[in-house]
Amino acid sequence: MARRSQSSSQGENPLDPNYLPPHYKEYYRIAIDALAENGPEAYEQFLMEEGAPDFLCPNEVEHISRSLQRPPESGQENPYPDSVYGSQEDADGSSGTYWPMDSDTAAPELDLGWPTIYGFQGTEVTTLMHPPPPDNPTIKEEVRRMIRSAQQVIGIVMDIFTDADILSELLDAANRRIPVYIILDQMNCQLFLDMAAKYRVNLNYVEFLRVRTVSGPTYFCRKGSTFKGNLQEKFLLVDCTMVLSGTYSFMWSFEKIHRSIAHIFQGELVSSFDEEFRILFAQSDPLIPSESALAKMDKSYMGMVPFAGPRPMFDRKLHFMFPREENPSQQFPSYGVDPDRHYFQPFRREDMIRQTMDPGGMRMYGKNLGDPMDKMQMSFVQNKQLEAMEAFKRHSFAEGTFENYTSSRQYSRQMFMNNNDEYRLQSSQVQKSQFMQFQSPLGTARPQGLFEKIRGGRQGLQEMDEFDSRYPTKGLPGEGHFALDGPPMRPGYNPSNSSREVRHGSDQMVIGGEGRFGQRSLGRQKFMCQISPTQKQGMEPKYFFHDQDADKKPQENKQGLRSWRISSYLSGIQSDQDEEGLPIPLDPELYDDALVPVERAVPASDTLFKYSMDPVPPYHPGTAPHDLPYDRANENPMKFSMDPVQLHRPNVPSQDVPMHLERAGNESLVKYSLDPIPPFKPNVAGTDVPMPLERKPTANEILSRYSVDPIPPYKTFGSTGDLSVEKAKENPPAEKEKEEGLLSRHDSFRTRTNPLIQRGSRLRSSLIFSSSKLEQHTSTAESVQEMQKEQSTSELVSENETGRTTSKVAEILQKYRGINKDANSTTVTQAKAASRTIHEESEDGQSVSAEEVAYKAVESTVDTKGSMSHVQQESQYRSVASSHLESLLGKHQTTLSMSKVEQMTSSIQTIGNISAAPSESGPTVPELSEVHKQSSISHMQQESHYKSVVTSKLEGLLNRDQQVMSMSKVEQTSSTIQTIGNISPAPPDSKESGPTITEVTEATQSSENLPTRPNSAFHFGSALESMSQNPTPSSSLNKSEEDLAKTDQNFFRKGSMRLKQFLQSKAEKKAEEDLASDNAKAEKQHSTLRRLSKSDSQEVAASTDMEEKSAKSLSVSPPKTSSISQSRLSASTSNVIFSSNLRDDTKVILEQISANSQKNRAEMVKQAQQIQATGDPDPATSKPESKTEGTASTDAAAITRTGSFLSRSRFSRPSPSSPEDRDILLKRMESIRKEKRVYSRFEVFCKKDEQPSHADDNDDKKAGKIIPKLLGNLIKK
């Protein structure tokens, strides 16, 4: 039995269902050994004795007999030097029994380069048959198409390659500088070499072609004999993204007589072929060409002529058609320096003479418009005349070569004699396609400018109009530089600035920068002056050794495109630069947009002296037109005198100035400018007057072409009155227009700054309040002046939505314009408290009043025009809405039905929409005060009659309906009132139109006798007090609404739902717009905010002390008050979301407000005491009300007690102005926050999103619990 190490089925389980029995048979091995040692007869004899069938076909027997290699005998010369039994044993003393895992011989390298594929776009397989179905291409056609479409690399693995058509395609691809790797079968490679010899192709001189051979696995016999197999893999790999694999071989017979199949794989399956090709190439051996392939050829054009298509129009001697002559005594080979080898150089070159060997980076095509040329009589000998002119040609794409022509040519001769090693590329230096695509200069003109050339991918190509008349065509008889109409060129060339950009990246490239040997050429860029700025090289030593430092000029006021984009982007992040990242000179230059260096202009005499040795003929009027620079736009040869040197030289007639003087002036000035496109219009020939600067379209004009909402000019937006007026005084109109252009241009390039990101910093809030101390004690006259200035500015704003949208852009732009420049020119909004009340009349004449308080703390918003215009909108809205409401109430004060309630609510919203439009035109302050005064007088006339009607109706309702309605009806009506009060708020003045309780009516009536300034502050404080201390009007009105809903419940329910849906969007929009106020009302806001914060904290603290009592009074009216508290909290915090971090910054805000508003609070207390002393409660109203409450129910009595508590405690509470009271207040607020009684911003976000999607009942359940508890406790008292 065999040992375990000798078992071929080691590790396999015979009981496994997937077990595959081994197919190895011992007599196979013995029969092969007999065949290898003694021949076919011994093989057949062994099979006959063994009784086994023949397992080899005759072809296999013949192959083994033909390819068998026997081991060398001792003392006998090895007949197989390339076999595994070479003389290596004697050299290194290694034993034949030692088999290392890794070879110490380096694997061959893919020296022409190999692309790296990082990802695939899916997998696609296409099956090809031969012969093909009808209307389908053959496999050979697909092979040729794939080779022609190659851009990076071509890899072929083939057993037999004898198809000349495919070889012609491969040579064409190699001539396009695409690496071509061919791996052939080692035994059949001679067939490929014979085909190359037949068509006169010398494979040693095809630069981008590598041919290697691979054999099959080696079989080792018992006595040391070996034989190898064939390479039967067949596939074509193109760009590592496409593979054609199958049974098709590159032979004539496979195209004509054999049936075959092939598959085209695209996608991820190509990676396996990629790996297999690199493995085969690493195991391959070099191809040994035959002597016939290296034989000299007598006829030049015998090679590949029938297969290369039509002959070119000029002698394009292919370098692989000329054998190398081994004649070291001759300086140059007889076939000379091939122009194609000169022209098609490697994409990146590391040697020092790359510019000399790459003359101009392209073939200089030109056209002699005057002399006809015979294209068929050109020869390579005539082309060699250009060698003496190479120093005068433009340099290649990169710097770093010898400027001395003699030394460079001597170095070039040495390289040519040294096996052309300088033309070998490294493995990492493959380029997609470097075959130039040329365009006829007589065709359609391409767009000028650097950016258009970059987009078109034609930056390095030159056209005929860019060649000047420096080199007369008579120096090259019989040709106009080169033939213009050559063979058809292939597209896909992506030129680069230089090899330095490819290796080091484009971020280190400087447009127009200097190389290692002086100023770099800008010849590959188009210029509007139609004259190439490339400095032509003279043969004098003065030019080669001129002072390079004298040419260097610092560029201070101009930057490259990349630097400008970087600074423009950084200006959106760093706001410490003046003009959005552009360095602005202190004094504006007269020609700031000119491409002239700021320091000094180059004198024309210096330029003439420097280039006086140039072989340039002076200009004469009789010169032929084709010798002048060709202007493609105007067809005028003389219209090129628009050089920037005219701005700095005396007015000399252009006829008296030589052409090379003007050209040198142009070149010296444009040479040192980073922007190669001068913004000047062409001057008329013969005039030397400095041309005016071409007006550039402003940024707004450019944006208006591509955007729906163009940005209005910046002057329309002015930050505040002072800022806009002072800026207009400081800057003249020209500077102001320039300034606006800079701002708008930078703003169009960078991303808009999100105002929501720059929020919520405690330090920022404290700094804002500390800076606002300087502005708190401004006089009333200054405030009125600011308001008037702002009014005049706001009149320029359009009345459509575009003006409102772009005002936010103006706010963002204004942030970056010196906030710290002038403290008086900016207004910092500190805080704002807004009280809105909406009143509606019920069927019985009872007033529905729902108040909401929006507490806003704006931390870091610098006011622009929007703040003043918004204040004016509010004041006008109050006056118009209150007067309209009072007129409506006067008409329908006795017989208002439920339908009238809905009509009136819609009227309120209509007034808000109508009054919003006129408010943008900017009404003056006297108009606002006059309207407000008229509305107050009309209200006082109607109030006396209205109070009696309301009292009688209320008494009748309470006597008639004493039963408590069900909980569902209460929730429905309360949610409706909450929706009206929350979503459609009116300004505070409108609450005077419909008072319900006697105490509230008298308080508001007496408040109208005050002056204007204390009046607004008093109304503000009254609204806050009434909402924070006791929401009695809401609860009493909700009680009356229960009785009303009982009579007409269905109609009221439908109407409320329609109101809620209709008013939702407008209320949110109004709440968001109500953001800031001006500096004139800062003291009033401080006082009202102080009242709000203390009252809020007190009611929240009271709610925590009396939690156990709130459950008992839940059946009376907690659902109603919950709705009102919800509306109050949601409206206030929804605005706070966009303005401040209330939870983090309230302590700092309250400290600053309380410290700054001591004087105002003292004045408010005095005014409140005066009002309380002069106020006369109406006994006729209070008595019937108390009587009704005593006879009707305990709920009404509780409401009456609450109302009396409101009247007693409204103005009697002393102002806690001592530091101890403030400390107690702050401690309470901190304790409440620790118990999470205050909504955070994130909770408000969630609640705001969930409110519209739930029913009314769910909205009531989600309301805050602070106000209901407080109300319940007050009612129980």
Curated annotation (Swiss-Prot):
Pfam families in alphabetical order: SACK1
Regions of compositional bias (Polar residues) in chain numbering: 1-12, 777-805, 971-982, 993-1015, 1112-1130
Any one annotated GO CC term: cytoplasm
Described purpose of this protein according to its UniProt entry: May play a role in keratin cytoskeleton disassembly.
Family: Belongs to the FAM83 family.
Protein name: Protein FAM83H
Biased composition (Low complexity): 1204-1215
Domain of life: Eukaryota
Coiled-coil residue spans: none
